[in-house]
């Protein structure tokens, strides 16, 4: 199986040129993305320091990691917590194994958007200065009061913050019954799985882990990597169990993991969560990227239960039938056929994976055919489809970083800090690596983890926030204006959940119909700007915007002006019977 992929990588190298990539272990394409001359399509700089995103991330040891707990890093969220129309930034933080003075404990950070390219840290004022082994974050208005609430996952008890609407948050975890079982939670997503108008909550769980009994580097086979003692896991450690909470509508949730048959899928190390209606039946499904084990694709049975169909659907393994070490995931219609596809990042000595949706309930691994099989050196985490040049074709951003600091000392063919990768969608089902010309925000090496994207300044140019291990976050700002048009859609549910999470949006512009969904969560344990962004290319108008709401209502909105964020309220459009379920 490995050799099949190795030969495929070598074939691509030869097709590109004799010097395009240099084979290494397992067909490793060892050339860095920063080594080829290219025309600038996008140019990203890291503007975090100037913008005020200065708080360091703290996550375990710096030079060595004794336990797997110290390696996973944290997610980030882009959301408008104060409803001023400008997205703000929330960065989850971790801690260390050693003792630390109480007043110096690292905390999560909330940054308020000042509308001028800068942010102000309002963490203390907002009541979000929580400490612990933070992991992921997802956003959703669970009580439909018009203000976005925050759910933060931890190694330990998770936390639900209710947005009070006055710039502050209240920890309502115990009241809401969503703390979990004290396990190691990772990715999460608010999702109205039963379409009752109230957001439910799905939480992925990684490893059943206890520092007191965990093996140490070199203790067993799973504690070695390429002959070097490293932290142990996840293989050899007990797996966690994913959780589902049903929103009762009174400020509380009910644990329905067993009732919904979520726990019938076992033996997986769950990492990131992405929701999508992959079979277009109007009911949200759930994809979980899993470390060192097959991915999970929970199909919504429309009766309050789910069935894992990843294997039969072709989304559990790569095309060689090999389970991969999945980290992050993103959803998008990369080839413009109206179906939602899945992209997943993986561990080093492997490629990322692109699953093309065939429209019949199955997927094909088209990684190599799409030109995405170039790199096996990097260890991928956060990833997102985003249209960097607004040409109407979603591009791909990948964040990388190794888990073993030892790679720098032992010269194992990888670096602990790795560059990001930016692929430009060519509009013909393939991608081109444009990292070399995409600016220092892409080519500078960091040990990245979480990634969220959004239109931070409402100008149609998508920015990205990246959490970095034991360093401040990065704020990747695109300096180029493409000249293409765009539109952003903010959904406001009335019968459906207020955020419109789960709504499928179709935009008709010229000869193209663009498709995406409103979703919470995704990437690596992160949450993106939920205003859905569409690049329109040279089209100077949109014919219509169609929204299929979770309630089942499908309606069209006409005469929406382009080059701006437009709000669409459920029930205010023209009813359309072409997509109701």
Features from the language model and the residues they span:
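Repeat-based blade/solenoid architectures
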Residues: 53-75, 126-138, 177-189, 238, ...
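Beta-propeller blade termini
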Residues: 73-83, 112, 133-147, 162, ...
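Hydrophobic beta-strand segments that make up the repeating blades of beta-propeller
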Residues: 86-93, 145, 149-154, 201-205, ...
